[in-house]
């Protein structure tokens, strides 16, 4: 007999925010319940907060629709950020020169799973 699935995940790829900045937000919600994590994200004044909230809501929707899990029982079991491809640009400088600018992107993954009993 197949095992019962107790987790669901969502990923946002190539988001135009540096992974270092997203990690500050991700670290706030790891291990929290879904309701608490969404409340934290709503009141966190960082540019990555709405993006992480969107990924979290997507993971919850995946859990509800694909695996029939209850929203109240879900916790953020895993949340991590990886670096995406870097967009390389040039900024004009004095005397006809130019400096390289790295526009960094990130891949955001959030995994929600049911609370452990006990």
From Swiss-Prot:
CDD domains cross-referenced by the UniProt entry: Ribosomal_L22
Gene3D superfamilies from the UniProt entry: Ribosomal protein L22/L17
Highest taxon listed in the record's lineage: Bacteria
Pfam families the UniProt entry points to: Ribosomal_L22 (PF00237)
GO molecular function, one term: structural constituent of ribosome
Disulfide bonds: none
InterPro entries (UniProt xref): Ribosomal_uL22, Ribosomal_uL22_bac/chlpt-type, Ribosomal_uL22_bac/org-type, Ribosomal_uL22_CS, Ribosomal_uL22_sf
Keywords for this protein: Ribonucleoprotein, Ribosomal protein, RNA-binding, rRNA-binding
GO biological process, one term: translation
A single GO cellular-component term on record: cytosolic large ribosomal subunit
Statement: the UniProt record of this protein carries the keyword RNA-binding: yes
Family: Belongs to the universal ribosomal protein uL22 family.
PANTHER family: CHLOROPLAST 50S RIBOSOMAL PROTEIN L22-RELATED, LARGE RIBOSOMAL SUBUNIT PROTEIN UL22M
Subunit structure: Part of the 50S ribosomal subunit.
HAMAP family (UniProt xref): Ribosomal_uL22_B (MF_01331_B)
Function: This protein binds specifically to 23S rRNA; its binding is stimulated by other ribosomal proteins, e.g. L4, L17, and L20. It is important during the early stages of 50S assembly. It makes multiple contacts with different domains of the 23S rRNA in the assembled 50S subunit and ribosome. The globular domain of the protein is located near the polypeptide exit tunnel on the outside of the subunit, while an extended beta-hairpin is found that lines the wall of the exit tunnel in the center of the 70S ribosome.
Protein name: Large ribosomal subunit protein uL22
Name of encoding gene: rplV
């Amino acid at each position: 007999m197949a095992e019962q699935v107790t987790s669901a995940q969502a990923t946002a790829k190539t988001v135009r925010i540096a992974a270092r900045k997203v990690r500050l937000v991700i670290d706030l919600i790891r291990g929290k319940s879904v309701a608490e994590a969404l409340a934290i994200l709503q009141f966190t004044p960082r540019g990555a907060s709405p993006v992480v909230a969107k990924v979290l809501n997507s993971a919850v929707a995946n859990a509800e629709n694909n695996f029939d899990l209850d929203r109240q029982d879900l916790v953020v079991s895993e949340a991590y950020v990886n670096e995406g491809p870097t967009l390389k640009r040039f900024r004009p400088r004095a005397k006809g020169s130019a400096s390289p600018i790295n526009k960094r992107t990130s891949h955001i993954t959030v995994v929600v799973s049911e609370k452990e009993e006990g």
